[in-house]
Amino acid sequence: MHSPYLTGHDFYRFYQCPHWPYWERFGDPNLRRPLTEAEEQRLADGLTHEQAIVTKIYGGFDEVKTKDVDEAFAQTLELMKRGVPVIYQACLKSGDWVGRPDILERRPGKSLLGDWYYVPVDVKRAHELKKEHMAQLTFYAVLLERLQGM
């Protein structure tokens, strides 16, 4: 079953194929073919790559580990209020919009949080920034704008 939330992945999927988000949300899940072993491996490799890049670039970071949206959002908001430098696997929420950027990076500047604000960063296995990546990051930026008042 598809999430009841509008997510950054929905925007990514839309740019891949405009019909994809519709079928994800309203299509019969029994008609969906299971992932192949190669597809499962590619997903696992992508996560391993992401974790390696985040560790290499940022070293230490605070991680939001829970998958529950409300718990993950509460943890993320608490870390943002504390002003931690890097949040890995953050969860942003506003109404029925939910985003899970790979990283939130703290920057100096005024926001509702204090003398800092956060920007979204996503790790991709690509040599160039694609429009679907920009759509995801823009979605996360809109959520951050709502949360940070800027």
Residue locations for each model-derived region?
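Metal-dependent nuclease catalytic cores that hydrolyze phosphodiester bonds in DNA/RNA
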Residues: 1-113
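Mg2+/Mn2+-dependent nuclease catalytic core
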Residues: 82-150
